[in-house]
Amino acid sequence: MKYLSIFLALFLIVSCKQKEKETDALGVVNISVTGNKNALPHFKKGLLLLHSFEYEDAREAFQKAKKEDPEMAMAYWGEAMTYNHSLWQEQDYVDAAIVLEQLDEINSQQETTELENDLIEAVHILYKPKTEKKERDIGYSEFMESLYKKYPANQEVAAFYALSLLGSVEEGRDDVIYGKGAKIAKGILKENPNHPGALHYLIHSYDDPNHASLALDAANAYSKVAPDASHALHMPSHIYVAMGMWDDVISSNIASYQASLNRMEKKNLDNDSRGYHAFHWLEYGYLQKGNQEEAKKMVLDMKKYAAETPSKKARVHVVFLKGTYLTETDEWDGEIANIPVDITDLNISVRSQYHFLEGMKAFKEGNISKLDSVLNTMEQDHKRESFVVAEGSSKLCSAVTRDEATEMDLKESEIRQNQLMALRAELNNDLKLAEEHFIKSIDIENSLSFSYGPPSIQKPPHELYADWLLTQNRNEEAAEHYSLALKNGPGRLRILKGIENTKQVI
């Protein structure tokens, strides 16, 4: 009996550890914080989830830590951090400010370490009152740099400094700053190869075709290190898309989307908890493999989800999936092309994507009046939003969301307008004007930094121009522009087919 009791005790310990591993496989972080023993596991889980951008679940974990220890200062720090989504252009200033007020009330009575006090000061800079968001982001990053120098061996300080660098770039990419972030992330990984933040931020730092191969090892590792974070299962596909690794894009996003469904069922959530982002990338992967049947089913499923829960998030993704399907398949006369979407309250970039699809459909049908109507709507929309952006928005003490127009949104919209204007000119047999608009769309694209993932400009400018050049029997020029398109979209099926067509037509 004695040996049996020992065996049972060991079995229970192993079983508990296995269960913990299965449910909380989120990576490894090393940080000591002040708090009671019941609060610490919740804090650690929140920190791990925070590094994988699982903001809602991270917030829930930090709130549990607060409940276990209402005077645990770092639990308030963590919750406040969940309201800043630096790489998604989102910030909930008001809710963060409420948490920081609570923190200020308890922090004066609570003994905290010097490191904790420094991190608390950092988060106050991130939400500094009466200060524009851009200024706050830069100030926060500069302060994190000072902490990085002060605590050179602290992996968490390094990780959040790396992220702050990426977040200090207001729009697009800055290779110098992103390279600096990558260097810091790689330094962490040398000491802790299972750090979820370092893996995650390294992938973001190298998320373009020119650098993607430098993060391939991190991409392959991240989903294994943090498989219980849906976003960690998706993130490797950023590198896989940039390298044209379509089978891996598909497998990554199947896993990520399924993880979101598991969470949805576990927490009894609505359709908005579905991983629509991964769902869109999965559709794109299928289309690059020529699996149009599965992709079409996904668009129809997305239509159904949006009908059941007609949120902004759902409607945005109907536009995304519809647009990706149509531009990749050219099925402008099918049922997908006729799916309506209420875009009135969406970002101008999404609205212009939808208008582009309507314009392309009109062009394919030779419906000049419809195309003119679409172009007029786009022009008025662009003027109105340009005025709003020119007036500026101080972002002193308000939420920042993706609904608000940015300079990049306006330029992307202008690209789509010029593409449709080129096609309109072709319908009018004005080939010179058509070419001018095609070239202008390319020039605008060249002024922007690389946009990762499925193309935001659904029909990339070099690719659409090359398609048009083929119709003009200018095959060598078409081949040149297909090659240029391939640099931004390695392995894209329509580009590869276009290159083959230039050879056949000659």
Language-model-detected regions and their locations in the chain:
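TPR repeat positional signature
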Residues: H42, Y76, Y83, D118, ...
